[in-house]
Amino acid sequence: MQNTKAYEPGDFIVKQGEASQGFCILKSGTLEVVKGSKVITELDVPGTIFGEMSDILGEPRVSDVRAKDEALVMHIEKSIDDLIVQDPGIAKKLIYTIAKRLEQTTSMLEHL
């Protein structure tokens, strides 16, 4: 099941520690990924997938995601495994998303 929801600045899309209910796709706006009181990164590219790691690993959310400005987010309330079987193209998008995050993390670690 999927639904699209509008968020106002400061609204939380996902909360750290929550059980995964699927994953999300940013349709418009800017989101902040927050750990504690620190903003880790911003998401502002339409089509960006987030929240997928908790779904893949079956673990609680590791950070908060909140709207920095008005944002539109699609919630996919279906397991990624089931979705990949129905739409194999989503697997390529997920692999790309995870690879880009790994690249960014590696780059950040190199500069420490």
Placement of each model-derived feature along the sequence:
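Polybasic "coupling" helices that flank or enter modular domains
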Residues: 2, 96-112
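Cyclic-nucleotide recognition modules
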Residues: 12, 42-95
